[in-house]
Every structure is written in C-alpha cells, then in structure tokens.
C-alpha cells in the first residue's frame, strides 16, 4: 500500500522535464551519490529518499521488486528532490517502456555487450523518430507536467551496464551508438567474466586496469561513467578517478550493516552515536 504521505507529495511537487537533474549535475561536472532500492517497500524507499541521495535506482534485476513495487518506489522518490532511475531486469522493450512511463528518468540496463544490444536499448527509451518507444506516459506526465513528451528524448538517460569481457572489447562500438549517455560498471559480474570471485570494490590489479580502461574510453567518447561500490571511501576514490556516479551498497545492506553495528555496540560497548528513537 502506498502511504498517504507519498500520494500527497505527488500532488504538490512541481518538477518539469526542462532538464533531468542528473544531467544538470553532470553538466556542472559534479558527481552523483546514488542509492539502490532493492527492498519491496514504499516506506523503505521513502526513508532512502529522505537520506540525501542525489539519485535512487530501483533495482528490478536483482532486487525483490516487481513492476507495481517499482511504481511505489518511484512515488516514494517524489517525496524529496531525488532523481529516480531504474535498473531493468533485462534489455526487453516492454519493461523498459513501462518503467519510463512510471517516471524513471534514466534506465540502467544489464549485460549490454554489443552495438546491436545498445541500439536496441536506445530504441526502447526514445520516441519516434529516434526510437520505437510507445507513447503512454501516464504517471510520468502527471509527475513532470505537459512538457514531458517534448523533452523526454533529450532528457531520459540511457545507461548500458559494462560487466563482461565481451562488452569491454566492444566499448567503442557501444559508446558510438547515438543516444547512449553513460556507462555503468557492474564489478561483480565483471570480475566473474575475468575469472575472479564476484564482489564489489575490486582491488585486483587486472580488474583495476580494466575499470580504468572503461572510464578512459567513455571519456574519449564524451560520455559519463558510473560504478557500484561498497564502501563510501571506495566511492570517493572512484570520483577522484573521474567517475560521475557511484552507488553505495543497497538499501538492504545499509540496513543490515547498521543493525549489526547497533547490536554489537549494545552487547560489547562503544559506537554509541545517540539519537532519537523515532
């Protein structure tokens, strides 16, 4: 159930499609700190929206999130000035278009390995004549106003994930597709593709070299690059390298880590930050 607070926020917030806020950040050469919504709860989404993230990504691939929950999470994002993105489960036109109709301002798509796959992704995100997106943005129109249709093609962000050897080999082809705005590095699958264990915050010299190469090729094409991180300190290192979006863990892992720390501090002492109960 969507909270009354969420519904009220949708009625009073006035956001236009004149410029995607994430595009505005990047145009100013500022990095975006991205949160990751994997829990199927509008309340947890609302909590995350109030935490100060620049962007929040609804994870429909590995998160416990179906389409109806994704809509609720984007409504939760509307309670604060946070830009909603979505990681779709696959490069499939139907779910991409429905996610955009629900109000996502950017699509992160997994396992884009070739130029043809990047072209298909762009086509699903763009209205004619730049793509094949079907028109029917019911919630997006309500959220962003009458200028949505006119501005969607230039403001919606198209972000293929780079997470295989094949994708790395095809970086120039993928980045040369008109309409691709940025890349997003998936470090766990990227590591698997090179024979390493799946994890975030890669520290293996070979993979660090690959990540640097991805960033360099993106910059060569005038595109931005994001990456999924675990520790905030690692995210800051990525910003220093030139990444312009970094995800910190997931909502579930943030909750788990905070809960563990609170239990440990209570049982063993130390780490008491104080604060309100509610």
Segment roles from a protein language model:
Residues 6, 12-278:
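Expand to "…catalyze enediolate/carbanion chemistry for C-C bond making/breaking, isomerization
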